[in-house]
Each structure stands twice: as C-alpha cells, then as structure tokens.
C-alpha cells in the first residue's frame, strides 16, 4: 500500500534514471567517436607547419603609387620568408583554411552528367603547397610545371571522397568536370581535368571526411595565407623568434606581418 501511495514519486525516479543513462550513453558515444576521428588521418600533414598572415597598413591602403607595386613588394616578402632560418619549404594559398572555420565551398559536375553536382571544399594553392603539407597522391601524379590557372584544361587535384562521388567510383585521373556556378560569369571556366587523386580529407582532426578540390592559385596577394614547413630542430620558440626577427623586415611597402601560428 505504501509503494502504491508513492507510485508517482517512483515513476519520477525511474524517469530521472533513464534520462541519466541516456545522457551517459550519449557522452560516452560522443567521446568515443571523437577519439576515433582524431586517430584518422586528415589527408594532409600539419605537423611542423606554421601559418603566416600579412595585412595592409590602414594609413597606406589608399596609396595608389604604393599599391601599384604590390606584386613586387609581396615577392620580396615571400622570398624573405623562404630564406628564414629553419624554413624547409614555403607556399601560399586561400580558400578553406585548416582549423579556422574559414571555408570556401562550391559545386562541380562531370561533363558526362551536368545534373550531378557535388558540393566540396576548395583550396587555391601554389605548386609548393603539396610539399609543405606532404600530400601524396593515391593515383596519378602532381606535375608542378603544369600547375597553372592558364593551363587548359585547368589541372585540379581531388580528394578520394570527391572523385568517388563525381565519377561513380571510377579512378578520377584524367576525368573532366566543370563548375556550373561559373557558367554565367564573364569568363566562365568550363573544363577542369583531374591530375591526381588524394587521400580523403577533413577540415580538422575531429570532423568527418568531406569532398575537397585543389586548384592553381592566382599570384600572391595579401589575403593569401603563407604556410611554411619548419625543420624539427627549429620548432621550439619558432613563433616568437619569427615575430621578433621579421616584424620589421617584412614591413615592405604597404604590408606588414599580421600573425603567425601553428
């Protein structure tokens, strides 16, 4: 009789217990999946890689004389970065930036089926990007001398995930595709050819694999990110040394060193 009288309280105890068990199960499952994801390769190697950002001095951004020599200044800056002690290789790129949440996303379709559009993350990169981030193709090969926006068809590298989605599991090397969103632009680029297929890619350790495409970058500008691979014995204190040594040296024309991080 006492249990019957306390039946409402007992029901709430069971409800609370079920809620706690569900939350506990969810937490364990979440941690497990994070750990599994963290052990999977991102598809590219960011260890010993530092990201360098430039910016324009506000007082000089409207100086037409200085800005007309922008390419020369940036070339000097890039050369100084390449020559800095401990730097093994340098590159520049823009689009989807690892670990920042700054992503560029568009769709591509194979010429064989223009209705089959696959969305993917994009990176526009210089030829040395693949050395800095140690990208090794699964099939095909990277040809630096052909990595040019003016090459026709324009060469691209794709992650395995994108290649499989676009070309129905066929080896994507040598296949062609186009970006339907560019068709109405002044100078539409209608033909991309897959130079090589890369391992599956993630934006960081804890994300799932997503379709990725790499395209040749335009010449270096201030909005590009510059990445450098640093020798292992130069890693300790590299950020602080670089900022101290290069803050003044990279202040060329309207540009200055904005940030460096690993």
Place the predicted regions along the sequence by residue.
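A short amphipathic helical element positioned immediately N-terminal to and/or at the very start
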Residues: 1-4, 77
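Acidic-histidine catalytic/liganding microenvironments
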Residues: 6, 81-85, 169, 249
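Short, strongly hydrophobic transmembrane alpha-helices
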Residues: 6-36, 44
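Short beta-strand segments
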Residues: 16, 51-54, 90-94, 119, ...
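Membrane-proximal extracellular/periplasmic loop immediately following the first transmembrane helix
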Residues: 31-116, 149
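Generic structural signal for small/hydrophobic residues in well-ordered secondary structure
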Residues: 34, 52, 81, 87-90, ...
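"Rare, low-scoring activations can occur
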Residues: 82, 153, 160-162, 185-262
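Hydrophobic secondary-structure segments that place a key small or acidic residue at a functional site
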Residues: 116-210
């Amino acid at each position: 009789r006492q249990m019957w009288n306390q039946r409402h309280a007992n029901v709430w105890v069971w409800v609370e217990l079920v809620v706690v068990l569900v939350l506990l199960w969810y937490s364990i499952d979440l941690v497990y999946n994070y750990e599994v994801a963290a052990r999977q390769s991102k598809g590219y190697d960011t260890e010993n890689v530092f990201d360098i950002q430039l910016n324009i001095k506000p007082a000089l951004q409207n100086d037409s004389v200085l800005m007309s020599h922008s390419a020369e200044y940036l070339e000097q800056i890039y050369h100084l970065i390449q020559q800095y002690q401990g730097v093994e290789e340098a590159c520049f790129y823009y689009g989807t930036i690892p670990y920042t949440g700054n992503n560029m996303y568009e769709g591509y379709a194979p010429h064989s089926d223009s209705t089959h559009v696959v969305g993917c993350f994009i990176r526009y990169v210089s030829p040395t990007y693949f050395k800095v981030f140690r990208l090794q193709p699964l099939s095909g090969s990277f040809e630096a001398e052909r990595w040019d926006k003016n090459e026709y068809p324009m060469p691209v590298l794709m992650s395995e995930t994108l290649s499989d989605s676009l070309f129905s599991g066929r080896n994507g090397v040598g296949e062609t595709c186009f970006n339907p969103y560019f068709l109405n632009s002044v100078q539409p680029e209608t033909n991309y050819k897959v130079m090589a297929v890369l391992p599956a890619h993630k934006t960081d350790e804890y994300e799932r694999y997503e379709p990725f495409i790499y395209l040749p970058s335009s010449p270096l500008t201030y909005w590009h990110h510059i990445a450098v691979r640093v020798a292992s014995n130069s890693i300790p204190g590299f950020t602080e040394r670089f900022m101290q040594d290069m803050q003044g040296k990279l202040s060329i024309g309207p540009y200055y060193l904005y940030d460096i991080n690993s």
